Amino acid sequence: MTRPRVFIDGEAGTTGLQIRARLSGRTDLELLSIDPARRKDPQARAELLNAANVSILCLHDDAAREAVALTTNPEARLLDASTAHRVHPEWVFGFPELSAQQPDRIRAARYVANPGCYSTGAIALLAPLTAAGLLSADFPVSIQGYSGYTGGGRALVDAHEKGEAHPMRGPFLSYALGLGHKHIPETMRYGGLSRTPIFTPNVGAWAQGMTVTIPLHLSDLGVSAQALHGALTAHYAGQKYVRVAAMESNPEILDPQTLNGTNDLDLFVYASQDGERAVLAARLDNLGKGAGGAAVQNLNLMLGLPDA
């Protein structure tokens, strides 16, 4: 039986390297590789994009759009890890846990957009609550994200690990303070929001691992923390990779690095003693469920392969 062929366009980048490492020991698929000297050659890329059953795009947005244009074989499928197509109407959003129907949509799709790391955590917390009517679409949501430096791409990785100059090299920095981070559109679309949230991302001097938090005044919502927890628990019941912690066993300290090297996503609901305030929290590996792990999960669905 012929093994499906997979090409990683952009395998030298942070996400591409992670995906290749996760796939390199697999015997149920064939990894196609490009000559390193020709990795930016459109003709060489086009040959592999059209020869592969699925190509994973680990590229900047413009290069990802170029890859789509280069893929002329109607049987060739694309899984895009960039921001370029996440809210595009012809692309299926690659968060299988979004709904009961989402895995089948991914299986059938020619084009799948891998979610962003911050938005994975935010959507995982928001989508079940807006779907259940516990959080209105126009509620003023505030989101904070805290990521290791690998979330900033190859240049920031080199700045921390090789001492190269970079404006975001430092022990802890807040950024995107113009409130226009690129993960906001997908967070709104798939988190069920009509009102633009305030999102403030932060990057620290650890390599990988992230948390995403959403503080809420429960009196403004008219619901209890227990109701929010119940909706999340019901939505993710039976999921392999997403877990909702029991409120009584919440850790007092959330270490963003706990899930490094996994495709897991942990969700928490914290509540004040007076029941007036809550914090929703998500913890994941920004290179795992936030990037490479999610891509492999989606790839397995697209190819009909066992979830490894």
Swiss-Prot record:
Signal peptide: none annotated. It catalyses: N-acetyl-L-glutamate 5-semialdehyde + phosphate + NADP(+) = N-acetyl-L-glutamyl 5-phosphate + NADPH + H(+). It holds the Pfam family Semialdhyde_dhC_1. GO terms for biological process: L-arginine biosynthetic process. InterPro entries: AGPR_AS, AGPR_type-2, NAD(P)-bd_dom_sf, NAGSA_dehydrogenase, Semialdehyde_DH_NAD-bd. It is an enzyme of class 1 (oxidoreductase). Its main location: cytoplasm. It is found in: Cytoplasm. One of its GO terms (molecular function) is N-acetyl-gamma-glutamyl-phosphate reductase activity. The keyword Transmembrane does not apply. Its EC number is 1.2.1.38. Keywords: Amino-acid biosynthesis, Arginine biosynthesis, Cytoplasm, NADP, Oxidoreductase. GO terms for cellular component: cytoplasm. The keyword Lipoprotein does not apply. Catalyzes the NADPH-dependent reduction of N-acetyl-5-glutamyl phosphate to yield N-acetyl-L-glutamate 5-semialdehyde. NCBIfam families: argC_other. This is N-acetyl-gamma-glutamyl-phosphate reductase. It comes from Deinococcus deserti (strain DSM 17065 / CIP 109153 / LMG 22923 / VCD115).
